[in-house]
UniProtKB/Swiss-Prot annotation:
Phylogenetic lineage: Bacteria, Bacillati, Bacillota, Bacilli, Bacillales
Parts forming coiled coils: none
Family annotation (InterPro entries): Cupin_1 (IPR006045), RmlC-like_jellyroll (IPR014710), RmlC_Cupin_sf (IPR011051), UCP019307_cupin (IPR014500), YjiB-like (IPR047121)
Protein name: Uncharacterized protein YjlB
CDD domains: cupin_YjlB-like
Gene it is expressed from: yjlB
Superkingdom: Bacteria
Cupin type-1 domain boundaries: 28-139
């Protein structure tokens, strides 16, 4: 199957700020061999990786972007807050989540597993949309550094071609 990308832009919903400029980028069929996922993203400059599931509540990272790669099975992940999009996510798919974009697992198979990583290995923060975290989070979202490379291709495209116009 050929890799396909889709983009989704989410406006600030009052609770989850989302990113003011960058869309979510979904890569369907990103990797044929998910066993190589960590090696691939690390080689492309994305590290501080972890594997597990996605939290079942809305959260976001204000200080960094994030890549998620579905390693095993499938899930439906909601991006962009309560009014966002519910996107099917299956083994081999990937998504680059801009700083500030909310995400939560709506449903999954019992052994659904993802790999998460961050450009330059940034130590990510965890925000849940509480009013007292918003002002600082909005500032940090705008300051989150652009990654040097696309985590899947290791090149400028497609991620930076989409984000930098």
């Amino acid at each position: 199957m050929e890799r396909e990308t889709q983009t989704y832009f989410f406006p600030d919903d009052g609770r989850i700020p989302n990113h003011p400029d960058f869309p979510l980028v979904v890569y369907q069929n990103a990797l044929k061999d998910t066993g190589l996922a960590e090696r691939i993203v690390t080689r492309h400059g994305w590290s501080n990786s972890w594997s597990g599931s996605v939290f079942p509540y809305h959260h976001y990272h204000s200080n960094t972007h994030e890549v998620l790669i579905a390693l095993r099975r499938e899930a439906v992940i909601q991006f962009g807050g309560e009014k966002g999009a519910a996107i099917p996510f299956k083994s081999g798919d990937a998504v680059v989540i801009p700083a500030g974009v909310g995400h939560k697992k709506l449903s999954s198979s019992p052994d659904f597993t993802v790999l998460g990583a961050y450009p330059g290995g940034v130590q990510y923060d965890m925000k849940t949309g509480k009013p007292n975290e918003r002002e600082e989070a909005v500032k940090q979202i705008k300051q989150a550094a652009l990654p040097a490379n696309d985590p899947i291709t290791g090149k400028r495209e497609p991620l930076l071609e989409i984000w930098v116009k």
